[in-house]
Amino acid sequence: MKILYISVECFPFIKTGGLGDVAYSFPKTLKKLGNDIKVFLIYSDSISEKYKEKMRSAYFFSLDLNGKSFPVEIFSLVMDDIEYLFFNDPSFKNIERTAYLDLHENSTFYLIFNKAISKFLELSAFKPEIIHANDWHTGILPLFLSGEKNENSKLKVVFTIHNLQYQGVFGASNVLKYLNEKERSNSLLSEIISNDIFNFMKAGIISSDIVTTVSETYKEEIKQPMQGMGLESVLNKYNSKLRGIINGLDYDIFNPSIDKYIEAKYDVSNYKEAKLINKIALQKELNLEQNKKIFLIGMISRLANQKGIDLVLNSLWNIVKDNDIQFVVLGTGDVNYESNLKSFGNKYPRNFKFINKFSDELSHKLYAGLDAFLIPSLFEPCGLTQLISLKYGCIPIARATGGLIDTITSYNDKQENANGFLFKEYTPEALYKSVKLAKNLFYNNKPEWNKLIYFGMDQRFGWEEIAKKYLESIYK
């Protein structure tokens, strides 16, 4: 099957969130399963020189829109048998191209990005059967492909919602002025535009053939007002084309048996001694008391409201006050959250450590050395960190939302094959209660604790299983 996969970020070129991991691992797996796939991305000056040096100019053309000419160059790089295509328009050189920007002036940039994809499809000998677009940045693309779909009835556009919070909302006039007559006459525009607002995410939902979300629970949650972010009525209307499939984990990258960053490698058959070695090594590196018996918990997170950082700040004192826990947070984000975490770390250095950066190497060491991993998200479409922590025998303590519900079987509920802890209420008290329950089990019932580790490590959330679901139930 021929597939064009479109994203604004992709590891190792540019990555600001979980989409970057998905856009690397998912196409790689589809390729391994025998599919012909290309990945369409955005060029950025921040891409490492070692990749830029391998790029070649594949296409150069101008897009003439509303009396203005936009020069477009598409670079090509082949890596691991996959061609990566990078859109570049030098007239937008000063725009910071990240997945979470939703700035007014960027409506034109993302419109040109999608127009360039449409033009590429005209020029290229590569004729995909599936176009898989991701998040709001690509939401307008199905409108531009109406002509392609008329000529090629086999062409199907799949649109994936990774995070409904970011929608690409712009003044309609700023978008419409760059559409041609055929595009402006599309009957779907009257439904997409509301109160002179053009919503790219809404456009993707309405105009694509199938809409997927990144977990079954999140699919249901976004049809409700609390998490629908204003689009719940649209999602309910188009419920028949809505699907929920969790993201996978790339075991070539996240696998304690081959992890180059950790002190002692291990798998489900020999984790006990290795995890203690990794724990002591982590404590030493972070200048914490080297104590293999203490309960060591942590977080790796973007410091944003979505991630439940306010709950953590309001629970910290209760969590560490008894001096029987070490707590580590690794992440960057909201400056107020950073400041408060730094302040707490300065007051209680014996029990709490805040590392105000992101480090891929250190994150691997945390997964291998921590006893438990905290994920107190307000909402979590899928979640990647719980999948990694499970693989590394690091017990997740998470709020019951989105993909966390779909991947964590809670010990609280006394379920068989439990692999973690879930709490329902979004309150500091509920978070603390769940941490306390986990701590008590860790200290007082090691056989039960080790069962959680075993069941977590023994589960499979690999991309091959997920890719087969897409091939069998979405793409075909």
UniProtKB/Swiss-Prot annotation:
Q: Which family is this protein grouped under?
A: Belongs to the glycosyltransferase 1 family. Bacterial/plant glycogen synthase subfamily.
**One Pfam entry name:** Glyco_transf_5
Q: Which organism is it from?
A: Mycoplasma mobile (strain ATCC 43663 / 163K / NCTC 11711) (Mesomycoplasma mobile)
Q: What does this protein do?
A: Synthesizes alpha-1,4-glucan chains using ADP-glucose.
Query: Key word Transferase present in the record?
Result: yes
Q: Quick one: which pathway?
A: Glycan biosynthesis; glycogen biosynthesis
Q: Which GO terms describe its biological process?
A: glycogen biosynthetic process
Q: InterPro entries from the xrefs?
A: Glyco_trans_1, GS/SS, Starch_synth_cat_dom
**Which NCBIfam families does this chain map to?**
glgA
- Reactions listed under catalytic activity: [(1->4)-alpha-D-glucosyl](n) + ADP-alpha-D-glucose = [(1->4)-alpha-D-glucosyl](n+1) + ADP + H(+)
Task: List positions binding ADP-alpha-D-glucose.
Answer: 15
Q: Which Gene3D superfamilies match?
A: Glycogen Phosphorylase B (3.40.50.2000)
Its Enzyme Commission number(s) read 2.4.1.21
Q: What is the lineage of its organism?
A: Bacteria, Bacillati, Mycoplasmatota, Mycoplasmoidales, Metamycoplasmataceae
Single GO MF annotation: alpha-1,4-glucan glucosyltransferase (ADP-glucose donor) activity
| SUPFAM superfamilies in alphabetical order | UDP-Glycosyltransferase/glycogen phosphorylase
Please give the name of this protein.
Answer: Glycogen synthase
Q: Which domain of life is it from?
A: Bacteria
Keywords attached to this Swiss-Prot or TrEMBL record, sorted alphabetically, are: Glycogen biosynthesis, Glycosyltransferase, Transferase
